[in-house]
């Protein structure tokens, strides 16, 4: 994360906004401030790169369920509003790095129609060319959304 924040390349060379989500309280305050400044400086594109740190899909679902029960509500659209990711669209694609083929407690509810791409490369070492390859593959997929 430190290396990523130190790079200037992500500020201008990519056609997407960068947003960090999750519990950032474990990070040094200076780093959180840098993250917030980066997010403010990247609001020009419709495309988004959303980086979740210290996020648990299970915790998110449990917290949303507790809120629903407390408010005596049972509706899928309202349930989604109680999730921490409520203002984030469900991901169209997910790149899983490090050679793992599991979700690892990430976005358990939100990935029902997400296309997955896998690489053995660890995230800090994933190259722009690999990401572009996955994006090109993604655009070749006929998405059916459960139909």
Where are these regions (language model features)?
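Flexible, compositionally biased loop and terminal segments
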Residues: 1-147
């Amino acid at each position: 994360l430190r290396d990523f924040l130190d790079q200037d390349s992500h500020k201008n060379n990519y056609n997407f906004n960068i947003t960090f989500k999750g519990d950032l309280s474990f990070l040094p305050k200076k780093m959180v401030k840098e993250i917030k400044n980066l997010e403010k400086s990247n609001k020009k594109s419709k495309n988004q790169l959303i980086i979740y740190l210290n996020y648990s899909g299970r915790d998110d679902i449990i917290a949303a369920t507790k809120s629903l029960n407390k408010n005596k509500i049972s509706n899928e659209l309202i349930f989604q509003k109680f999730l921490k990711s409520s203002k984030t669209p469900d991901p169209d694609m997910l790149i899983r790095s490090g050679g793992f083929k599991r979700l690892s407690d990430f976005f358990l509810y939100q990935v029902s129609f997400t296309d997955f791409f896998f690489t053995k490369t660890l995230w800090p070492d994933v190259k722009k060319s690999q990401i572009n390859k996955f994006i090109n593959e993604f655009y070749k997929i006929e998405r059916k959304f459960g139909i």
